[in-house]
């Protein structure tokens, strides 16, 4: 998924998964 296509909600979820 392109970073430019991430929404606030998606980015927030992706950041949490990554951090886990």
UniProtKB/Swiss-Prot annotation:
Keyword Nuclease among UniProt keywords: yes
EC number: 4.6.1.18
Membrane-spanning segments: none
Primary location group: other
Catalytic site positions: 16 (proton acceptor)
Keyword Lyase among record annotations: yes
Top EC class for this record: lyase
GO CC annotation: lysosome
Keyword field: Endonuclease, Hydrolase, Lyase, Lysosome, Nuclease
Domain of life: Eukaryota
GO MF: lyase activity; ribonuclease A activity
Subcellular location: Lysosome; Cytoplasmic granule
Catalytic activity: an [RNA] containing cytidine + H2O = an [RNA]-3'-cytidine-3'-phosphate + a 5'-hydroxy-ribonucleotide-3'-[RNA]; an [RNA] containing uridine + H2O = an [RNA]-3'-uridine-3'-phosphate + a 5'-hydroxy-ribonucleotide-3'-[RNA]
Oligomeric form and interacting partners: Interacts with and forms a tight 1:1 complex with RNH1. Dimerization of two such complexes may occur.
Function, in words: This is a non-secretory ribonuclease. It is a pyrimidine specific nuclease with a slight preference for U. Cytotoxin and helminthotoxin. Possesses a wide variety of biological activities.
Family label: Belongs to the pancreatic ribonuclease family.
Protein name (Swiss-Prot/TrEMBL): Non-secretory ribonuclease
Source species: Sus scrofa (Pig)
């Amino acid at each position: 998924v392109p970073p430019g296509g991430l929404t606030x909600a998606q980015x927030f979820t992706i950041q949490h998964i990554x951090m886990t």
